[in-house]
Amino acid sequence: YGFGTDEFIKFCRRMKTEPFLVWNMGTGTLEEAAAWLEYCNGTYDTYYANLRRKHGHEEPFNVKYWQLGNEMYGVHELGYCKAEEYASTAREWAKTMRRLDPSISIAAVGGGHEDIDRYRVVLEELIPLSLIDYISIHSYWGHREKSKYEGKDAENFYQVVAEPAISEKLIQEVACMISMIRRKHKDKDTRKVKIAYTEWNAWNYREGAGLHPSIKPFEPAYHLREALSDAVFLNILQRNCREVTLATVAQPSFPGILTSS
């Protein structure tokens, strides 16, 4: 790979977008995560801030949005853990990062669609301490088996187009959960936690995603069915804009990131 932090920040600035970085809670360490934050946002005479300067960036990147791991609720992830373990670790990581840079916005990982109770465990641990600004949700909808790509199967077509409604129900459930927990701790000046939809899209892959492109290529197939499904979800985001204040589509493609080596 020839595309690292410096190149990503440069790309974001060129595209006039705000970077959103994810700390590696699966196989990484708290020290590595803190070093990354120091590299990006540090202003003092410290090792990683000076390393950024050495790389030609005198001013800090001022990366605002950070997430505590990725899909730690999924057994497919390296570092998968139970809700209580994730919440406990996220608490300590968030405390550390807030002390390093109080200006950042931190997102914790929820529980996908399968485990609504996991959201409760994480939020009850982190909201009373005002450690997070967002709870992250990921949603994909579509045919789970090899699809008829031209959309001739009417049942499959309507299934894909209608499935975002499940995501809207999840938004409302999580938003209600946040409100109830904040009300429970109304004696504390807790942060107004919002929802960050950090991955969303129609899920239609020719053979499903493999563990590595050399084993099974990552080949999304998008047609009118998927376009309508995404259009439905864009309307859902509009309807729930008070609860969902950050959303990023997946999977984006950056061919320039990969190199022949």
Regions found by a protein language model. Name each.
Residues 47-52, 184-187, 209-217:
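Low-complexity, polar-biased intrinsically disordered regions enriched in Pro/Ser/Thr/Gly
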Residues 4-18, 96-103, 173-192, 233-244:
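A structural motif corresponding to the C-terminal end of an alpha-helix
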Residues 26, 83, 109, 157-167, ...:
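Hydrophobic alpha-helical scaffolding
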Residues 62, 73, 161, 258-259:
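Generic, ordered loop/turn and secondary-structure boundary motif
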Residues 139, 190-261:
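Aromatic/acidic polysaccharide-binding cleft in carbohydrate-active enzymes
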Residues 49-51, 118, 162-165, 207, ...:
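Charged, low-complexity, helix-prone segments enriched in Lys/Glu/Asp/Gln
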Residues 129-156, 160-207, 233, 256:
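Extended catalytic-interface subdomain
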Residues 1-156, 168, 172:
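N-terminal catalytic cores of secreted or lumenal carbohydrate-active enzymes
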